[in-house]
A protein has these predicted regions:
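Transmembrane helix boundary and interhelical junction motifs in multipass membrane proteins
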Residues: 21-25, 38, 49-56, 79, ...
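Helix-loop-helix junctions within the multi-pass membrane cores of secondary transporters/permeases
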Residues: 70-161
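Alpha-helical transmembrane segments and their membrane-interface exit regions
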Residues: 48-52, 75-82, 166-172, 214-226
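Hydrophobic alpha-helical transmembrane segments
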Residues: 13, 41-42, 69-71, 98-102, ...
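Helix-loop-helix hairpins and the membrane-proximal interhelical loops
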Residues: 1-47, 58-73, 150, 226-230
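Juxtamembrane helix-boundary/capping and inter-helix hinge elements in multi-pass membrane proteins
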Residues: 3, 32-37, 61-66, 89-98, ...
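C-terminal ends of transmembrane helices
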Residues: 82-91, 112-119, 170-180, 219-230
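Membrane-embedded alpha-helical modules
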Residues: 122-212, 219
Length: 230
């Protein structure tokens, strides 16, 4: 095996293991929101996009409707469609199963690893290695987190309410940094989303404020058109 392939695999597996550990936090958060172990596992296996999963259980845990929970998850998941368009020429998967697998594993981390690779072959290797490691780790730790949370006492279970916002922020912050390189702008956008959610909380059904805050941040981060001649 060449040094380049070894380095690509090492980086992919390392990133996959690190990100996969968030699955334990999701499993605990899903339990706190009232989902059982199997429901948490099905979400991780079929949805497989961390920020959307945390948004969904966060809305459900706050008493929001299923429609609001799905809406917030879909809003956060739309970026994967853009990633898919970018990765399609690079991966060029053949066969129904490979295309379905590639589409399912199009997330932030696999996209970043694939497009950062120096050539197409290493890009494909980085995508599949990162996707496989994160997928296996995420689902395994989801089960462990849900099982561990279900065995906690009442006081400890109440403390799980802090998991959703903390893990949600940890997953979203790198995206916010990419959209807004300046630290001061990052803080203003994050604070603006929080203000939107707080102002709407007494006025709208539970969960709707989360969707509105996500929309506000997404609109703030949309690409700006440059003026002609600039």
């Amino acid at each position: 095996m060449s040094a380049a392939r070894s380095a690509t695999l090492r980086d992919a597996v390392g990133l996959g293991l690190a990100v996969g550990l968030y699955g334990a936090a999701f499993g605990a958060a899903a339990d706190a929101a009232g989902l059982d172990v199997w429901q948490a596992l099905v979400l991780s296996a079929l949805m497989f996009t961390g920020a959307s999963q945390f948004a969904l259980v966060g809305v459900l845990g706050a008493g929001g409707s299923g429609l609001a929970a799905i809406g917030s998850a879909l809003l956060l998941g739309t970026r994967n469609t853009v990633y898919g368009v970018r990765l399609a020429p690079l991966l060029a998967p053949r066969g129904l199963l490979r295309r379905a697998g590639a589409a399912h594993w199009v997330i932030d981390e696999t996209t970043a690893m694939a497009v950062a690779a120096p050539d197409r072959e290493l890009g494909r290797l980085a995508f599949w290695a990162t996707g496989a490691t994160i997928y296996l780790g995420w689902n395994l730790t989801t089960v462990l987190g849900a099982l561990g949370a279900s065995g906690l006492g009442g006081t400890a279970r109440a403390a799980l309410d802090a998991i959703v916002p903390a893990a949600f922020l940890a997953l979203l912050w790198p995206r916010l940094q990419r959209g807004f390189p300046e630290a001061a702008v990052q803080r203003r956008v994050a604070a603006g989303g929080a203000v939107v959610a707080l102002l709407l909380t007494p006025l709208v059904p539970a969960g709707v404020q989360v969707v509105a805050a996500v929309v506000a941040v997404a609109l703030a981060g949309r690409p700006r058109r440059t003026e002609a001649g600039s």
